[in-house]
Amino acid sequence: MKLNELYNNIGAKKNKKRIARGIGSGKGKTGGRGIKGQKSRSGVAIKGFEGGQTPMIKRLPKRGFNCISTKKYNIINIYNIEEALADGRLSAADTITKEKLVEVGVVNNKNNKKLVKLLSICSDDFASPLSLKLDAYSSKAKDLIEKAGGKLL
């Protein structure tokens, strides 16, 4: 037996049916799409149509609303500021503002549209006396900063 004498078993590989290639092929002329109509045309898919049964979007109830005046916050934690201080990206002597945090990469805030809120998750001790000027603070974050001798502007 040689490599050029290897063949697939009979029936192991079957050519797929070529549709719409003449009436002699068995799937010619309309190519299994029926005659005329929207669904026989190319590029047509009726979105949300489930074959006549009531579609899912109609079966589920309407719920809630989107409040226009909701404030959207970028959340940062005290440990994010601690890391930036340790890296040297921020200095404890300066007032830390939203713009400064965006500049050093602590906050990703395109066009300064979102507000910045400081939380104290995973931080029970904070030693640096900082002066911060952000949009909002959690009560625990306020306590930690004021206990360390910092100021909230």
Swiss-Prot record:
Residues 21-41 are annotated as: Disordered. Transmembrane segments: none annotated. The keyword rRNA-binding applies. GO terms for molecular function: rRNA binding; structural constituent of ribosome. One of its GO terms (biological process) is translation. Residues 23-35 have a biased composition (Gly residues). Keywords: Ribonucleoprotein, Ribosomal protein, RNA-binding, rRNA-binding. InterPro entries: Ribosomal_uL15, Ribosomal_uL15/eL18, Ribosomal_uL15/eL18_sf, Ribosomal_uL15_bac-type. Pfam families: Ribosomal_L27A (PF00828). The keyword Protein transport does not apply. GO terms for cellular component: large ribosomal subunit. It comes from the Bacteria. HAMAP family: Ribosomal_uL15 (MF_01341). Belongs to the universal ribosomal protein uL15 family. Part of the 50S ribosomal subunit. Binds to the 23S rRNA. This is Large ribosomal subunit protein uL15. The lineage of its organism: Bacteria, Pseudomonadati, Pseudomonadota, Alphaproteobacteria, Rickettsiales. The gene is rplO.
